[in-house]
Amino acid sequence: MKVIVLPRRICPRCGSKNTATILWGMPAMTQELQDKLDKKEVVLGGCCIAIPSPTHHCNSCGKDFGGNYFTKPAFVRELYFYVGGYFGTSHWIYLHEQKYGKILRYVASDSHYIDIKSELADCNISLIPIVHKWAEFNKDLLRCYFIDWKSRYINQNVLDGTQWELNVTFDNGTTIKRYGSNAYPPHWKKLIATFHKYGLPIIR
């Protein structure tokens, strides 16, 4: 069996490019495979294929990532995103599939706090429907690998500055909470680009 190695991916937890493709099952050992194992371009996942099975391994921090995260397809039920600080414009994004439908609610404001989740929010909320792109939106969101991010990214050398928060609940009950202060995870720009792809302004 010929071993195909994809370009090395960035670890979504530590940002290292020293990653390897996970090869599951019982491949025939060849000199080509042994060379890739020695170079840590490939790691063996084991003869029993895990479900769900990650596709990549980080040689730096040991994190396995990629592939399907759930045994059955799961879609976003609720999403809350915030980025901002005491100075400049803050941004809020909210989605609640059961309460508001497949619609992204978005606010940009100089205010320090806006309850974007409330129907009575006293602000100008932009509504961006994504009902016809729902499956694609969920797929693109997962490709930001936020499930693999650390729970907190903190730069202790900056007191004020910019804070951000991402909370996502899936329809299978899984909830992911991520937070940062003046520090950002790998694939952060990819997340911002994903929101822009579905009709939101570019968040800087």
Predicted regions and their residues:
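A composition-biased, non-transmembrane "mature-region" signal
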Residues: 2-7, 24, 28, 53-56, ...
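N-terminal domain-start interaction segment
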Residues: 4, 9, 69-128, 152-179, ...
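Short recognition patches in nucleic-acid-associated and regulatory proteins
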Residues: 9, 13-51
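Short Cys/His-rich metal-coordination motifs, predominantly Zn2+-binding knuckles/fingers
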Residues: 14, 59-62
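Cys/His-rich microdomains that often coordinate metals
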Residues: 18, 64-65
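Charged, amphipathic alpha-helical segments
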Residues: 130-155, 199-202
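Short, surface-exposed linear segments at secondary-structure transitions and domain or protein termini
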Residues: 182-197
